[in-house]
Amino acid sequence: MEEGSRSQSPREELELSMLDGPQEELTPLNNDLRIQPNSAEDPSPAQVGKESPWSPCNKSVVGKCKLWMVIVTIFLCFIIVIVISLCLVGVTYIDEDENEILELSSNKTFFITLKIPEECANEEGLHHLLTERLTDTYRQSPSLSRFFTSADILDFSVENATVTYHLQFGVPSEDDDFMKYMMSEELVLGIMRQSFHDKNISTCESLGLDPESLLLYE
């Protein structure tokens, strides 16, 4: 009984007073304390700092049209315009040299002699094939087609196995530069040699392949 009625120590009284203090201090004012939930749409400061550098391109310009769509469309239109311009330039380009009208008031004559290989010397109709080849070669030549007139047989010798042709071209009068560059023996003979190298005559495949078998003179 003495122990139960013993008065409490000062320390115990202090602890009890702290526990039994006014509860008003623990209650929020006006009971307005609310927990604000984090919205998924509101980016956190860390997310804002890590925003993609391409995010401005995803902004809407008109309706659902994004900025990147506008940029890509402009770029494609620019490429299409360039391609169309290049096509039009290629179609409408006019070569002034091809359309230049020259007054071909003079004639230029060459004689070309072809040595026929022995295995083809007795081939019938060979001279006709050669005439067609010479005519087609110069008529289809980009350099001399405008000036070529004719190719005629001048001599056909079975004994010597040679055939000589008379080549005639129309040329401008008194044009030294034209005669020097466009009607040179090297050019006329070179076109013929190239023709034999590109395509042989079926009945005489070795004809014209030997450089010594072609002779051109005026």
Swiss-Prot record:
Residues 1-54 are annotated as: Disordered. The chain crosses the membrane at residues 66-86. Signal peptide: none annotated. It is a single-pass type I membrane protein. It is found in: Endoplasmic reticulum membrane. Its main location: endoplasmic reticulum. GO terms for cellular component: endoplasmic reticulum membrane. Keywords: Endoplasmic reticulum, Membrane, Transmembrane, Transmembrane helix. InterPro entries: TTMP. PANTHER family: TPA-INDUCED TRANSMEMBRANE PROTEIN. This is TPA-induced transmembrane protein homolog.
